[in-house]
Amino acid sequence: MKRRDCLAALVGTALAARAQATLVGTPIEWPVIELLDGTTLAPAAWQGMAAVIVFWATHCPFCKRHNAHVEKLYRATKAQPLRVLTLAEDGNADLVRRYMRSHGYGFPVALSDGVLRRRMTTRRIIPMTCVVDRDARLRQAIPGEMSEDDVMGLAQAALRPPG
C-alpha cells in the first residue's frame, strides 16, 4: 500500500472516531416515537427520564442474545425513572411483532426511521446500545453484543448524576 493510501486511511479513521466522540455528551432532542403497540411517545414523555436505547434487527443473532438481556433490564427497572426503548432496523412491523412474540419479549419497540440513531451515533453496527441520562445527554454509545452483567449495569450508568 502506498504511503499516501495509508495516510488517507489513518486520517479517515481519526475523523470517524472524532465524529463519534463528539456525539457523547450532547443533548438528545427526542422525536415523536410511535411504538408497535400503538403507543405514541411525545418528546415531553422523556423529561426527567434516563433511557437505554437499543438499535437491532430480527436477522441478527447477536441482537437475539443481546435482547434477552435487554428484556431482563426492562423488567428489572420498570419502577425506576428509566425508559428502555428498542428500535428495530427491519422496516417491517409485522415481522418485528412476530419476532417479539416468538421470543417472549415485552420491552417497548418501534421501527427505526434513522432519526434517533443519527442523533446518537454515526456507527451503523447492530446491536447498538445508547445510554441517555436524565438531563437528556448522551452518555454512552456501545456497539455490539453485551454481557448480561454489562446490560444490567446500564441502569446505574443512566441514572448516575451527571458530572
List each model region and its residues.
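Structural microenvironment flanking redox-active thiols in thiol-disulfide oxidoreductases
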Residues: 64-103, 114-118
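Short loop/turn microsegments at loop-to-beta-strand junctions
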Residues: 28-29, 51, 126-127
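Short active-site neighborhood of thiol/selenol oxidoreductases, capturing the structured segment around
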Residues: 45-61
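A short acidic/small-residue loop/turn micro-motif
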Residues: 16, 48, 145-147
